[in-house]
């Protein structure tokens, strides 16, 4: 069973594609320097420039790129610096 991944908050997709390290990945800008990154998807179902709503499906968990097993690498960045996601949940 493929597990879906979802946008953590509303925003605009700025990257939806392939990276050698992140595999199939999605990057969403939420404004004010806040960005979320979702890595290692088996497939993605959004495209760059697309607006997404909080909770909208963006892809499926996978093990692409530098990965040893199926998982979602979720990262929050503020002005380009990784920050604790718990501060935004």
Positions of PLM-derived features:
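Catalytic cores of peptidoglycan-degrading enzymes
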Residues: 1-89
């Amino acid at each position: 069973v493929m597990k879906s991944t979802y946008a953590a908050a509303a925003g605009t997709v700025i990257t939806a594609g392939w990276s050698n390290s992140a595999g199939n990945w999605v990057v969403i800008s939420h404004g004010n320097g806040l960005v979320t990154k979702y890595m290692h998807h088996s497939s993605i179902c959004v495209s760059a420039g697309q607006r997404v709503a909080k909770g909208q499906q963006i892809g499926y968990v996978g093990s692409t790129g530098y990965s040893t097993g199926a998982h979602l690498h979720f990262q929050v960045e503020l002005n380009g610096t990784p920050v604790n996601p718990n501060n935004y949940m």
